[in-house]
Amino acid sequence: MRAPVRIRDPIHGTQRVTKSEIAVIDCRAVQRLRGIKQLGLADLAYPGATHTRYAHALGVMHLAGRMFDAVTLDMWLDPADHHRLRTTVRLAALFHDLGHAPLSHSTELLMPPLAELKLGPWAGGHPGRRATHEDYTLAILLSSGLSELVRERFDDQGVAVEDVASILSDHPPSDFSRRFVIDGRDWRPLLRQCVSSELDADRMDYLLRDSYYAGVPYGRYDLEWLLEHLRPVERPPASENGPRPLHLGLASRASFGFEDYLLSRYHMFLAVYLHHVPVGYELMLDALNREEAEGADAMKLPADVDAYLEWDDLHFFYLLRRSSNPWARRLVERRGFRLLVERTQQDSEQEPLRRGQLPIREVVERLRSEGIAVRAHDVKGKLSKYFSPEMSFDPIQTPHLPGLAPSREEAPTPTLFVVEEGRAVPLEAHVALYRRYRDEVSLERVYVAPEDMDRARMLLEQMEP
């Protein structure tokens, strides 16, 4: 049956959506994403990067459906179960970013304690920690008008709002996880990997989309080749009578394509996501957020879901323009701190400082002792956030300083496998890129106020002959 609505997208071409999906796409919670830029302040360096999380959400929904189609191509599923699982993963993909605050990750320091969101059993451990955008996503899905809309439009298709939340949650209540067991197979790990894993619809969309709108080639990779080689992998049950979990697999012929995809992500982080210009503004926003978090309550993000949905980029900048805070004035007037020093190093190199070169910490202290306004940051990370029982990889960090993104207990990501001659091998044992890029990369930067730049350069020359 032909889909009633087609959406034209510059990245994926025509996307087909059903009437029920259009109903939730048109709801307030999803439409709010039109007002939140995907890359936050990156358009200060890349003027074309003004695309929004709304277009990204549609793209992720489209790719999640294609991933599900690929892994089930040679599997038999009852048509009703096939439709239910496919619809569930598409909705989870559409909703995965609902909880983002203005400017995406940049304002998460203003979020309240998790307990104030009243997620109950969906909160997982550590209720005293600060909430994250993932927590807000669950709160919006489970306790806003969207929840009733999903029930109204999808109950007759066997899709419950809790099913969608179970895919998005690290620690869903066990009662809901059992709904994914069909003929002794547990589909939840595979569906969750389609939305959140090393090779997921989220990353596959944002690399291509961000690269396109930033006007750089670094995020391109062979999407079609990867999709064509996705495979389901059935693993032994965790207990004697338990279900057999299904995981996402990739045929070995696509391993080079996967390496290309990983390197695309790596290069996008260095060239776009960590570009020194928006990072300089992120540092000022971080200073503003810390002052607001400690004092005035005008810019605290509300725990109430309906009130939170009023916040987007325009609302945040409206508050900035009204603020007398010096950091807010700099942000509004685009008087960003400028890059003075940058150093990059990989652990395997272990290069000592060049002769006469001071550690970054000493540079900062010397500049401050001369009355120069300084902001510094140190980003450390690895190529991948991939987790398995044998080895772990931390994500390359986004340019938000320690403390801006709250600590969050995450469940281990289900293992991604490479399928070769009927055998399923954990990805890190097959893809050599993990071994070549396992070391941590450190990126250190020092920024100064533009009015202090000339004096700071002179002092730096005196420090490092």
Q: Positions of the model-derived regions?
A:
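Terminal helices and disordered tails flanking the catalytic cores of nucleotide-processing hydrolases
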Residues: 272, 277, 286, 296-465
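Sequence-structural signature of the catalytic-core scaffold of metal-dependent phosphohydrolases
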Residues: 1-91, 99-350
